[in-house]
């Protein structure tokens, strides 16, 4: 958080929070996103219900003006829609939704509006397509389609998360050391 001193009131912050950070949370951001819920950190949480409830804290304290973005392709995540108070956008790689979605021929839309091609996304992996669908749903109406496309084409990802290291003898090497659970490590290989 070395940039905290440079943050102005009109700036927007994007923060990824773990279940450990969310478990005691009693306030929610204006925009909340849950990409996927799967059995993670069950060595710390007493059971899956505790883990899911911790994650849901990100949206439970929103008001009627809040925006929640959920993955329609993940049943546990989609079920969180029952707990939202404001506008809820669903995103999907498989079917049309009220948020961002990807068609079978690789076109990305928000509702009925075409945005870009899936192939425009520079960073590899179907999970990154889902991340873009979530991000588009989170910023729709506040960020132009042109900016969304530019970011997709130019963003190289974040350090330690499927970070391209080099290509040697036809093999592409990636650093995915941030993957802290088996499911995250497996997703990074797809």
Describe these PLM feature segments.
Residues 1, 17, 181-185:
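Short glycine/serine/threonine-rich phosphate/pyrophosphate-binding segments
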Residues 3, 7-10, 29, 34-173:
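Acidic, Mg2+-coordinating active-site environments of NTP-dependent enzymes
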Residues 11-19, 173-178:
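Switch II (G3) loop of P-loop NTPases
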Residues 19, 39, 74, 178-180:
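Short, glycine/acidic-enriched loop or turn micro-motifs at the edges of active sites
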Residues 22:
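Carbohydrate-associated surface elements
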Residues 26:
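Hydrophobic Walker B segment
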Residues 157-160, 173-187:
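Glycine-rich phosphate/pyrophosphate-binding beta-alpha loops
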